[in-house]
Amino acid sequence: MISIVMNTNDWKYYYKRTADAVACSSNMLYTALMNPTKDILCKHYCINEDYQGHQPSMTQEIIDFFFEREVKFLEELQHLDCTPKLLEIDRPNNKVFIEWNTETLAQIIFDPSRSIDDEFPNWKDQLYNVVKEFKDNGYYKLALYPHCFFINKSGDLKIIDYYSVVPHDDYFIERKLIAGMIGDQGSYRFDQSETDGVIDLKNFFNLTMNIH
């Protein structure tokens, strides 16, 4: 890991592409910033209405909670083939810097002029290997959307958003800790995994894999 704090003053927002071809913020927990050469991504865990829009339920407490999870599991799982190289952690400013390569899979999949099969022929095998690698090492990876993956410069599939990593032996969490970041799209998975205010994230993962 490098030892200086990166200056992001001239970095640009990174926006994901959605299924209806709209560019929007890539995450509700952090501001995604891409350097001019598009090979480093800064994940700035903060409340930024300019990037994310108004989020009345989001609090700094929730942001900090997920920042700590991001750092913990990125560091803990650097040995996995699918984990992007961690370049720097700027704790005072809640920033994480990782290797990057221009765009996520969402940019390819949701662009009718592009084909993931043509650009990345073995994507299915690599995706299977990502899920298997987490399983074999004793973890669930809950966020598996197209915008959570990118292809690095070596042609390897990498996955981001390590705040959504859950150990096999520690998969319960109180809903009140994360309620402010539960969106409408996948809220049923939280609802169906909750008992007495506690969410079973193992069940959440199974719903993600089998239904969502």
Map each language-model feature to its residues.
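ATP-binding glycine-rich loop module of kinase domains
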Residues: 14-75
